A protein has these predicted regions:
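Sec-dependent N-terminal signal peptides of Gram-positive bacterial secreted proteins and lipoproteins
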Residues: 4-25
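Cys/His-rich metal-coordination motifs, chiefly Zn-binding "fingers/knuckles"
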Residues: 1
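Extracytosolic ligand-binding ectodomains
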Residues: 21, 25-402
Length: 402
């Protein structure tokens, strides 16, 4: 009798364990009661990187509103939910759980890289498709469900080196980077690898969170360089430029990547007060006067005003929403409002990894004012989530009074 009772108890325990195991494997469809298709995102809406997060939220919402005004997806409205992570990876676990359990079916991932490296693991475990506008780390798209609208760090570093090889031959090159930031180090490493040997060894100067209050030492180390590569964000870049004014060569060029977008709008920094030139590798020109990008800019300013942050992060988010929407249409699948995140992920992967071509506002525009964007190479092979489009070099400020 005791043996039979023990066997029964063991069977119940094993049964409950199996139920628990299956429940934790993504079987729950938190979207089963959805009446809209929910897009989730996490980004800095407050703090030092808020200029990026706000632009992403505004632009994604603009795209959602435009799509909904035209009938949504087969009559189903889209809904955007974006949470503040303050550019802190420690906030991602809570944000992701809130988004996923709140019915998120597809995602824009995160705005910045460090939080994105945390986000990708959760999204992979639940098979949630995400297309990030601006988390550039190479490993963001490590798993098969992650994609980037922005150029990955390796691509930014390599493309920037091509600009230097073509435009700055014979110049003395310096590099100012953040040694405790994956974004900065990743771009720097790939830039150095692709830089022509004729430049010799670049002059290196770095900083960390603990040393970000003053760059007098770094300015001194780089003051004789002709071109200073800055794979960093705009706040520390602006501080370096302010402290380097009158010390760094007057006709030097500061050259960055997407993190420098917004450098001309940093509080308490007048970019025209320095003599040096400022340029960065980009996939969007916020001052363009024509094409689809201009249409987006006009709509953005009409909705949010002239003082709202406007940058390539936001433009990429606008493209992200439309790319997801167009891919859903292109799939021909019977997508309902309560489709599970996993099922929608499989549908979208089938598009992005094959012959799906998106015409967007980021990347070098073609004759019709739009750019060609894919996630495959020239031979049609999947690029493991990395975007394929033509970058542009954008000049914020020319050298003056040198």
């Amino acid at each position: 009798m005791k043996i039979r009772v023990l066997s029964l108890i063991l069977a119940i325990v094993l049964s409950l364990g199996m139920v628990s195991m299956f429940a934790s494997c993504g079987e729950t469809n938190y979207a089963e009661n959805n009446t809209t298709i929910k897009l989730g995102a996490s980004g800095p809406l407050t703090g030092g990187a808020a200029m990026y997060g706000i632009a992403v939220k505004n632009s994604a919402q603009l795209a959602v509103d435009e799509i909904n005004a035209n009938g949504g997806f087969n009559g189903i409205m889209l809904e955007l939910v974006m949470l503040d992570d303050k550019h802190d990876a420690n906030n991602i676990a809570t944000n992701y759980a809130s988004l996923y359990e709140g019915g998120m079916q597809v995602s824009l991932g995160t705005v910045t890289t460090k939080p994105g490296l945390e986000f990708k693991g959760y999204a992979n475990a639940d098979n949630v498709f995400f297309l990030t506008p601006s988390a550039t780390g190479d490993l963001i798209a490590e798993f098969g469900n992650g994609y980037q609208m922005c150029f990955a760090d390796s691509d930014q570093g390599t493309a920037s080196a091509v600009v230097f090889n073509n435009d700055y031959a014979g110049k003395k090159v310096g590099i100012f980077f953040k040694a405790d930031d994956d974004y900065s180090v990743g771009i720097k490493d790939n830039f150095v690898k692709a830089l022509d040997a004729s430049f010799g060894t670049p002059v290196m100067a770095s900083f960390t969170d603990a040393t970000a209050d003053s760059f007098t030492q770094q300015v001194s180390e780089l003051k004789d360089c002709d071109v200073i590569f800055m794979p960093i964000y705009y706040d520390p870049a602006a501080l370096f430029m302010k402290q380097g004014n009158g010390i760094v060569k007057a006709d030097a060029i500061y050259y960055g990547c997407d993190g420098l977008d917004g450098i001309d709008a940093v509080e308490n920094f007048d970019i025209n007060s320095i003599t040096q030139g400022v340029s960065y590798l980009s996939h969007f020109n916020s001052n363009t006067t024509e094409g689809a990008a201009k249409t987006y800019i006009d709509a953005y300013k009409a909705k949010y005003g002239n003082d709202a942050p406007l940058n390539q992060f936001g433009a990429a988010a606008y493209d992200c929403v439309y790319a997801i929407y167009e891919a859903m249409k292109s799939s021909g699948a019977d997508i309902k409002a309560n489709i599970s995140a996993s099922d929608l992920c499989d549908i979208l992967k089938g598009e992005f990894d094959t012959d799906f071509v998106f015409r967007g506002i980021t990347g070098a525009p073609e004759a019709d004012g739009k750019s060609t964007i894919t996630w495959t190479d020239k031979d049609g092979n999947a690029t493991n989530g990395h975007v394929n489009k033509t970058p542009v070099s954008y000049t914020v400020k020319e050298v003056t009074n040198a």
